[in-house]
Amino acid sequence: MSSVEIRRVADKKDLKAFIEFHYELYEGNPYDAPNLYSDEVHTFSKDKNSAFEFCEAEYFLAYKDGKLVGRVAAIINHRYNEQWERPAVRFGWLDLIDDIEVLRALLGAVEDYGRSKGMKEIIGPLGFTDMDPEGMLTYGFDQLGTMATSYNYEYYPKLMEQMEGYVKDNDYVEYKLYVPKDGMPEKYKRVAEMTMKRYNLHVPDLKRSQVFGPEQYGQKVLDVVNKTFAHLYGFSQMTQRQKDEYVQMYFKFFSMDMLCVIEDWNTPNHDVIGVGISIPSLTKALQKCRKGRLFPFGWWHVIRALKFHKTDVVDLLLIGILPEYRAKGANALLFYKLIPVYQKYGFKWGETHVEMETNSKVQGQWAYLENEQHKRRRCYKKAL
């Protein structure tokens, strides 16, 4: 009989313990990018997170000998399940000590929750939507994490290998892209200039008022994401409420010279057909925010990274081109615009977001930059 006790998160005190367990487990870790506490509260609150329009969830804590030793979220994304005809419960935000009993108890709680809701399989690690961290790190444990992904210790996948019935569902890869010290790679320059001339595509210099004002470039960016990511593993279409939420929560932090859009001027409204969003790495700044709090001193480190670019690293949060424009070389326009910006701020390399290992077209974009595939993540599945 297991000595691990599973408790459902039932109140604010439990939720605080759920959120803070990650900070405690990874305190002092040089690679983890801990999320802000306020963002975590928003994510897990049913009355704040717009994903609860089509998701339901429960959160579980694991205790051993009276001590908190693990946590996990059980999530059902009904929108995804219906779109992909896949009745699955997701497990996410999995953290635990190096103990197989704890893992069995945590995933057992998610499995039981899924069965009670009529689900036929368990998949993960996944969040509520594609905007949440995805996959368990299986390679690259000595590499700097990003705010858009999650970090885990090397023993996590080793424990997963001991879990009966769990097999690979999908692998992601991540790349380190080295910024050219000077000049533009000839391939990007040639293709970008040809594409602008031949297809009448343009990359405007955006103002902040255009993102939040009547022109609604923030909404246009997320419309492109909905269309571009529609076929990807784990993705569900963003609702209007989600788009409103993401624009208000995140776009205020973006520097306008690192928010890149491509427009087709052959269309009456200059339709946005491609997007690229980068942000200075906040990992080191977030590590200095004690237990994810901006106050009393954490805010300065975040502002220093965002406004003064006091980091060598830039995170490539999002790159998307509408399918009908990919063969036209539109992606080269993004780098044509962004590489000089990276050089101006002194960034030495960029960290890509997760990419499906089978997505050779996305990975082909990096061929003309010095690059290194330095991380790998896995999502698992098990029939219930």
Q: What is the role of each PLM region?
A:
Residues 1-31:
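Generic start-of-chain signal for non-secretory N-termini
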Residues 2-4, 150-232:
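Acyltransferase donor/substrate-recognition loop-hinge adjacent to the catalytic core
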Residues 123, 176, 261, 277, ...:
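Short beta-strand segments
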